[in-house]
Curated annotation (Swiss-Prot):
It is found in: Cell membrane. It comes from the Archaea. This is Uncharacterized protein MJ0779. Coiled coil: none annotated. Keywords: Cell membrane, Membrane, Transmembrane, Transmembrane helix. One of its GO terms (cellular component) is plasma membrane. It is a multi-pass membrane protein. The chain crosses the membrane at residues 32-52, 56-76, 199-219, 220-240, 246-266, 273-293. Its main location: membrane. The keyword Coiled coil does not apply.
Length: 299
């Protein structure tokens, strides 16, 4: 296999299989490749049935397969986001345990008993390494924190390790970290709430209303050209014209989806592909459904 194909395979298929394992999903390479083939085949069949242009077919395949390739990384990002959002809750439990005179190990055990999503599993692994593998606290925290792509978790591990090494009041350090994380979460939520309403209105108009209006106009022209055939010099609406309109709606809604993803998630290619797939699907469904059934209204 050529070197560039090997590199591409590692960065797509292999990387996604690793992410599935981190997510606890039993998914091997053959299953994932088969899933991609099915996802690519569905838009091909739809394009053939609807007599779409080659360009529309390519756009369908690229957007849907691209979204499928990024779904494992998106799921993993969601897992890390849940972890980081729940860390402050775990920190307050640890603070209460430490202030009551318990050790770090006992504080970690309290978090494990609390069953905090994602966080309890991490501290359970730390305790397992310390009790069963006889590793030190510093080694256990370093190993477990490096298993996750979370800057917040690594920061927490570093604070706890440095405090244990050089001394100090760990509960005060954890209070500062918990308050900082909560403030950041609140600012992020406020920023999203400010932009969400405007984005929602724009989403409805650009991905639903405009394709629907375009389809209504097309349906009207189809009905009028059929009724006045041979009477008025109105050229008939050809299948090529419908396919061209479908292509414009498809490209427009896909681009809009990619642009909408940026203010919500940042410049993340995976999210842009996923939102593009959603907006494109909504747009083309609105266009095709109305174009299919609306001519009867005008006839």
């Amino acid at each position: 296999m050529p070197k560039y194909l090997t590199t591409l395979y590692k960065r797509t298929i292999k990387r996604n299989i690793i992410l599935f394992k981190k997510l606890g999903k039993d998914f091997d390479e053959k299953k994932f490749i088969l899933l991609l083939i099915i996802i690519a085949a569905i838009p091909l069949l739809i394009s053939y049935y609807l007599h779409l242009t080659l360009k529309s077919m390519i756009i369908f395949v690229v957007i849907y397969v691209g979204a499928a390739l990024f779904i494992p990384s998106i799921l993993y990002e969601n897992k890390i986001e849940t972890l980081e959002n729940n860390i402050p809750q775990a920190l307050y439990i640890m603070i209460l345990a430490l202030e009551s005179g318990r050790s770090i190990n006992e504080a970690l055990l309290e978090v494990v008993k609390s069953n905090i999503k994602e966080v309890s599993d991490i501290f359970r692994k730390v305790l397992y390494l310390m009790e069963n593998q006889k590793l030190s606290f510093e080694e256990s925290m370093t190993i477990v924190s490096n298993l996750y792509d979370s800057k917040v978790l690594r920061m927490l591990a570093r604070i706890m390790i440095e405090n244990r090494k050089y001394g100090g009041d760990l509960s005060d350090s954890l209070k500062i970290l918990a308050k900082t994380l909560e403030d950041f979460k609140m600012y992020k939520r406020q920023l999203l709430s400010v932009t969400a309403s405007g984005l929602a209105i724009g989403f409805i108009i650009l991905c639903g209303v405009i394709p629907a209006v375009a389809a209504l106009l097309g349906a009207y022209l189809i009905a009028v050209s059929g009724m006045l055939s041979g009477v008025a010099p109105i050229p008939p609406v050809k299948p090529e014209d419908i396919s061209k309109g479908f292509e414009i709606v498809q490209m427009g809604t896909a681009i809009i989806g990619a642009l909408f993803a940026i203010p919500i998630f940042g410049l993340k290619i995976g999210r842009m592909f996923l939102i593009s797939a959603v907006t494109m699907t909504i747009g083309v469904l609105a266009y095709y459904t109305i174009l299919k059934f609306a001519p009867g209204i005008f006839s």
